[in-house]
Amino acid sequence: MSESEARAAQRAVEVLSAYGVSHVFGVPGAKIDSIYDALVDSGPQLVVCRHEQNAVFMAAAVGRLTGTPGAVVVTSGPGTSNTATGLLTANTEQDPVVALCGAVPRADRLKRSHQSMDATAALKAFTKYTGEVNDAGNVPEAVANALRAALTQPRGAAAVILPSDVLATPVSAGITRACPVPRLGPAPAEGIEQAARLIRDARRPVILAGVRGADPEACAALRTLLEDTDLPVVETFQAAGVVSRTLDEHYLGRVGLFRNQPGDIVISHADVLVTVGFDAVEYDPKLWNTDPSRTVVHIDVVPANIDNHYQPAIELQGDVASTVRALAGQLSGLRLDPEVLGELAEQRRALKDADDTARTANHTRAGLNPVSVLLTLRDMIDDDATVTCDVGSHYIYTARHFRAYEPRHLLFSDGQQTLGVALPWAMAACLVRPGKQVVSVSGDGGFLFSAQELETATRLGLHFTHVILRDNTYDMVRFQEELKYGRTSGVQLGDYDIAQYAGAFGAHGYRVETEEQFAKVLGEALSREARVQPGITIIDVPVDYTRNTELFAQLHEGVLE
């Protein structure tokens, strides 16, 4: 190998560095060990995980939190197939992530040999870009194009399949600088003017902020619009935090899953609905837009996904931030009718009343009130804390009651509702937001989907708190089965000693029985200097979910129409 040459594996690492990738997550193996070897000398920080699925969760969270793709490096066969759920979750929820997957040597590709599989065919269904490289000289460009695909809107997951003999081959060509994805300009001026007229002429205009509206620049532009208008905003789960604390009077709650929130009432009464970066996967339009003739203004970087219940009158396709800024210039000083402002104030009171009612609802000896626990957590954390939420009944309560004031600081799996994401996401948040409070929340079922990564977290010296709301069932399934069939099946789980489990990995584990105990342990765990409780704290909180069928309650049409 000449001085100008390097193994293709080294060239792949150089591309990751050129594109600003900060962390590589994975589990090593013989078919990908050349990249692990290259990472010894240079490149992103390597984080060795306990399972490839969790490695993808961590990388995807880095992508969501920073806007720069996270990277995963895994071996062939099961190492690659184990990434499927993580890649599917990232792709659906538009988190930029790239997986570099080892493969058997090219000569064994079509043989029935150890760990041979058609990885490209397997992963294409879960990614927006997947390709196998058969020439070592093409490795740098393949990795670069995967990174660009992950960053192109709608963002998502990409994978590159790399046979081990290709990675070991010396090549001279490399890519040492990033080629950024071109940024679009604002939507056409005439469309913006038309949209501004519709909004100005409307009696009850409403903004529905979605996942791409929570991108930092888009969020800043939306806040500029709100500062000089009376426009109300309803957030999707993925847009949590778009409305800042100083703009709280514009906030009308979050919507998703079940059509029964104050935000649903506000949306149903809107004569012009302005969607900003909204994706149908966040909240199926058939659930909330029962009158498709209602005027919808679609602001997004991608075209609308037309269906029977979502047919925008105007599509403003372009850079969301630039488009919203241009629209703000034409809506400056927009004021709503006092009667409409009164209606909105009534729904804001309903939001507060819902918090108060849920917080004080009776609970049994079986456990604590889950909403009260979550609101205690909200009261005790900083506004710049990162809270990651797993999937389960607590996920619905969190989305409805837990306020966030900065985007990408309250994280949900809203597209696939994937169990086990919260703990790996929290670990990623610790890596990219050092010194900030990080809390993850899960049920006792979801916790065990990724709990083995506690070893990874303690090995890395991370500091965060994980709250487990435990009822020993798959409760989100349980209460829906009760509503459908009047009985349950397959949802009962056994108890386990969470405190001992945590201690086995070097974490601090506690089981609390009262809200006072919870607040005390949480306060010690959140100590910014980590003097009281350094490292990782796992808090086991028994909760009473007997009122969960109320989550599914439907508002009657007289309220909604």
Question: What does each of the following model-derived ranges do?
Answer:
Residues L226, V266-I267, P370, S450, ...:
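Active-site-proximal structural scaffolding
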Residues E282-P285, S293, L327-L336, V340-D355, ...:
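Hydrophobic, well-ordered secondary-structure segments
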Residues S2-R335, T376, M380-D383, H463-H466, ...:
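N-terminal alpha/beta PP-like core and its mobile active-site loop of ThDP/TPP-dependent enzymes
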Residues S2-E3, I175, P292-S293, V297-Y395, ...:
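Phosphate/pyrophosphate-binding active-site segments
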Residues D108-Q115, R245, F258, D307-H309, ...:
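Thiamine diphosphate
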